[in-house]
Amino acid sequence: MGDWNLLGDTLEEVHIHSTMIGKIWLTILFIFRMLVLGVAAEDVWNDEQSGFICNTEQPGCRNVCYDQAFPISLIRYWVLQVIFVSSPSLVYMGHALYRLRVLEEERQRMKAQLRVELEEVEFEMPRDRRRLEQELCQLEKRKLNKAPLRGTLLCTYVIHIFTRSVVEVGFMIGQYLLYGFHLEPLFKCHGHPCPNIIDCFVSRPTEKTIFLLFMQSIATISLFLNILEIFHLGFKKIKRGLWGKYKLKKEHNEFHANKAKQNVAKYQSTSANSLKRLPSAPDYNLLVEKQTHTAVYPSLNSSSVFQPNPDNHSVNDEKCILDEQETVLSNEISTLSTSCSHFQHISSNNNKDTHKIFGKELNGNQLMEKRETEGKDSKRNYYSRGHRSIPGVAIDGENNMRQSPQTVFSLPANCDWKPRWLRATWGSSTEHENRGSPPKGNLKGQFRKGTVRTLPPSQGDSQSLDIPNTADSLGGLSFEPGLVRTCNNPVCPPNHVVSLTNNLIGRRVPTDLQI
């Protein structure tokens, strides 16, 4: 039985490196084979030769008949079966121990490497030091009691299952050929040196038959476990391969999904930052107000409503706002052009080639050249402010004079304009007209072509204005040609529309007339 103990200790190591079905197989091998052979089978088969009795006195005949009846002792046959069936497991155990030792050496080498890295890491790097300590603790806890069943070790395990299954089948076939499934109590033998057919009797044949069937059943169960373990490993291998492909595909899909989410989040953050940097366009009233103040105070800095922004989107917004302003300006120009056409029709009968400024004749060509020069200078100053202002707004004369009394109006050269509140007439030739009657039909004292006059402030609907015709009065007037713009074009262009300014008020001489 000492040999059984050595074999049992060796198979215990195999038990550690086996699968669940392999452990069941080893349990059956230990309990139902080795234990039965060691405890009960020897007692049953101990009197096998002594209890074999033959009806002859011929020397040697009983031994020849016993050899024919029991060519091999079943107890020894079963011992050989256990040894041969366990031998592939011993080979697998040797390979598993070798792999375990290799893994342990690799673990020790990694531990030594981590300790060296941990010693080299400075205390100023706590994150790296903590990471190395965690890896070292994991290596300490990762001490393997058995080698993982993968790679070449898995191949060895499958081969050893096939081998012991083949051995099991061989011993089962051999036992059947030798003894069958039933042991007869009477055995007839003939042969030399027996003179004739000799009858021999087997001791305890029923008990031996039971043991025979029991050992054959244990062998069948072991074979079934071997086949089941092969299917288990194959199914596990296939499942692992399919799961690996599914997991790889899932990780691939998750990677692309996360990448798409990151791109969307990055695009949203970029769009949000761009929207934060975009300046909001002011409304129309605020824009007109800012540009009006800019025209009134030209010495101040230009409005910063549309100052260039480092972001590229601000340029597009500025262009959009300027387009909107130009659209509004075009509408206003159309309205004013209609009014100018009406006044041009009224004053078409009084057109002349000369311009009269308070009784003084000026050459028309010189005045046109002067106006063009002033218009170019004003355009240059106008576009150099970094933004575009609305050149003019259609303003009702009466309402405008009530809102801003200190305003100088610049009319086109070919547009004679007379406010409704102005009851008086202009020029020395119209002083004898009725001052109380409002203009009806044809305007009295209409502006001549190219005539520009400064409008006095209105004191009421019934109040009129008398402009003396003397030279002193004419000489006392201070006229600002740079601030008054006229147009000689039949269709009033945008740059000759009404402009608002207070420069005249700031530079007025005592003799100037106020509006």
Swiss-Prot record:
Subcellular location: Cell membrane; Cell junction, Gap junction
Gene symbol of the encoding locus: GJA9
Organism from which the protein derives: Homo sapiens
Subunit structure: A connexon is composed of a hexamer of connexins.
Family classification: Belongs to the connexin family. Alpha-type (group II) subfamily.
PANTHER family reported in the protein's UniProt record: CONNEXIN, GAP JUNCTION ALPHA-9 PROTEIN
Residue ranges, Extracellular side: 41-77, 188-209
Disulfide topology: none
UniProt main location, coarse: membrane
Keyword Transmembrane helix: yes
Statement: the UniProt record of this protein carries the keyword Oxidoreductase: no
GO MF annotation terms: gap junction channel activity
Function description: One gap junction consists of a cluster of closely packed pairs of transmembrane channels, the connexons, through which materials of low MW diffuse from one cell to a neighboring cell.
Any one GO CC term of the record: connexin complex
Protein name: Gap junction alpha-9 protein
Pfam family, one: Connexin
Cytoplasmic face residues: 1-19, 99-166, 231-515
Entry's Gene Ontology BP terms: cell-cell signaling
Organs and tissues of expression: Highly abundant in skeletal muscle. Also detected in testis.
UniProt feature, compositional bias: Basic and acidic residues: 370-380
Compositionally skewed regions (Polar residues) per UniProt: 456-472
